[in-house]
Amino acid sequence: MATDRVRLALLRRSGRRAQLLKLTQRLTGGVICRDGQITDFEALTLICRSLLDEAGCQGAALALAVPVQGLTGRRLVLPADSHPVQRWRQVQSELAAHGIGADDHAMDYRELGPPPGSPSDQQVLAVAASRLIIEDRLSLAAAVGRPLVTLAPEDLCLAAWLREDRLPGEAAVLRLDRAP
């Protein structure tokens, strides 16, 4: 979703490969999104429903993209033998040290592997997104009546995410990002 359009990519998983079945977009005729936040929820819901009601989209789960400008990321190096709870606390502490609070941000992290030259450590990418942006997308998935399988950062790792095995057999990827 850009300020004036919604894009849909319908993918089908075939083994380890994702096959693109359909790529389409609809112009909205007005502003529906500004700085990653949905400004006209009803119009967006109607457009998304019309896209998802097309042939081939029945039963597809959603993967919604979060605009990169709504994300904050930090690369951290943590002890490899730390427990996931310890890593989570370290991620929260590091993000808090940069002024990112858990009250107004959703936080997550992704393990990236050992850093070069230090196999006893683990690199992680700590990511925080505005709760308003996340809640917008959760509400949109609920409004169109589709299960949400992920919220992926657009342009940062959406292509890599699409290559991974996390997608169900079929998924409709609604791009919620900035205008081209």
Where are the model-predicted features located?
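Conserved NTP-handling cores and scaffolds of large molecular machines
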Residues: 13, 52-55, 99-102
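Generic alpha-helical secondary structure
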Residues: 37, 41-45, 84-88, 130, ...
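Amphipathic alpha-helical regulatory segments at dimerization interfaces
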Residues: 47-54, 94-97, 140
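N-terminal phosphate-binding loop and adjacent alpha-helix
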Residues: 23-54
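Short hydrophobic alpha-helical segments used for membrane anchoring or interfacial signaling
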Residues: 11, 65-66
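Hydrophobic beta-strand segments of well-ordered beta-sheets in folded domains
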Residues: 60-64
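Small-residue (GG/TT-enriched) beta-loop-alpha framework at ligand/catalytic clefts
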Residues: 1-26, 56-58, 88-90, 115-180
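Internal amphipathic helical hairpin motif
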Residues: 25, 41, 66-124, 162
